[in-house]
Design a protein with these regions (language model features):
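Alpha/beta enzyme core
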Residues: 2-42, 47, 56-217, 221-227
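The substrate-binding groove and active-site-proximal loops of carbohydrate-active enzymes
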Residues: 51
Length: 227
């Protein structure tokens, strides 16, 4: 599959994300809020689908990067999805050692703590970038969400923290509610070209003002979208 993408003209391959172990801890932080009241109704067994496993483990992911590098001549970009400083550093280094030409940091964080300030959340993002940049030599692109009070300023801070690129925008998992079973159910809805407009707007605003490369994700479906 990867070789066929190169044959079709792809300039680089961005791998799907390796989810850092701290994500499991984050799901448990969110879980109490979503499972509240599940024992109040006989039909409500669980409001939140358990995240017991991922599609591939860390070792298999690293092996896949090595195999991809051996199979193609174009750059292979690893992707790491996580939160904690220690885990980010460990897997960032291992992804580089596996042969990745660059790394995408896909920071996925849902701040459910009402005592946590916006400043503290922003600092956590920036600290992650600094810690990873201090450990790897390959370029690091940060995949971010638009949910910052001042995204333009945050983009500049990401660059100051060492980001070589910004990928806009992360698409958070948004489950649905089954009113009959009183459960939270997965409901993955694919994007359309309309979803690209927010990213296009911000790239147009920031291009030339923030010295960083931009990449747009979500909503790019046709060659017109690419142009």
């Amino acid at each position: 599959g990867i070789r066929s993408l190169e044959d079709a003209g792809a300039a680089a391959i961005t791998m799907y994300s390796l989810f850092e172990e701290q994500i499991m801890g984050e799901s448990h932080l969110v879980d109490p809020y979503l499972t509240y009241g599940t024992n109040s109704f006989a039909a409500a067994l669980d409001y939140f689908p358990e995240m017991d496993s991922y599609n591939v483990g860390p070792e298999a992911y690293l092996n896949l990067i090595s195999q991809a590098k051996s199979a193609v001549d174009i750059p292979v970009i690893g992707s790491l999805n996580g939160v904690s400083a220690g885990g980010w550093i460990e897997y960032a280094k291992r992804i580089q050692e596996a042969g990745a030409d660059a790394l995408e940091l896909n920071i996925y964080y849902i701040p459910t703590d009402i005592a946590l300030t916006a400043t503290e959340v922003e600092k956590m993002y920036l600290d992650d970038v600094r810690l990873v940049k201090a450990q790897v030599d390959i370029p690091v692109a940060v995949k971010v969400s638009p949910y910052f009070s001042s995204f333009a300023n945050m983009a500049a801070q990401f660059v100051d923290a060492g980001a070589d690129g910004l990928v806009v925008f992360n698409r958070f998992y948004q489950p649905d509610f089954d009113l009959e079973q009183l459960e939270v159910t997965p409901n993955l809805v694919f994007s359309t070209s309309v979803a690209m407009r927010l990213a296009l707007r911000w790239v147009a605003i920031l291009y030339g003002k923030v010295p960083v490369d931009f990449a747009i994700t979500n909503g790019v479906h046709t060659y017109e979208d690419v142009l």
